[in-house]
Amino acid sequence: MSSNLNPAQQEKALKLELRLAQISKNEGCQLNFLDFVRSQWPEFIAGRHHKIIAEKLERVASGELKRLIINMAPRHTKSEFASFLFPAWMMGKNPSMKIIQATHTTELAVNFGRKTKNLLDMDSYKMVFPEVKLAADSKASGRWDTSAGGMYYAVGVGS
């Protein structure tokens, strides 16, 4: 910063610089799934497999890839990515989107719905996607709506 600025001007310039950096970061999170994951999960450490999954999910989001099956060993974040963070990211990109979350049990599907719904209410999410709001009457974890007409519905296919 230029030393020709008085302290008040320096403070104002610094605040503007920080705001511009935040806007740039938010735009990156809106466009890049892995950047979004890092913004919502600061402790996350990306491995090679995470980058591959994120790229494939981005291709699903763009409509370039119509079907995707993720087969990996347990505890490799496939559920965190595909069933929790990806629906939240997609809802942020398109708040009028309708999402059906299907798992082998209703309990598991509703749990993902609860996590996703709670994320949409967090300040860190609202910084990236400020236009996304839950509908006022959305109380259930397994079936909720956005104020833009989007919907999330959790269903179990086994029980």
Segments (PLM) and residue ranges:
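N-terminal accessory segments
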Residues: M1-K66
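Contiguous, well-ordered alpha-helical segments that form the cores/surfaces of helical PPI scaffolds
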Residues: E55-E58, E80-G92
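Walker A/P-loop
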Residues: E64-L85
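Residue-level preference for the first positions of well-ordered beta-strands
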Residues: R67-I69, K98-I100, M151
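Alpha-helix boundary/capping segments in eukaryotic regulatory proteins
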Residues: H76-A82, G92-K98, T103
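Post-Walker A helix-loop "phosphate-sensing" segment adjacent to the P-loop in P-loop NTPases
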Residues: W89-K98, D121-Y125
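Conserved nucleotide-state-sensing and coupling region of NTP-binding domains
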Residues: A102-Y153, G158
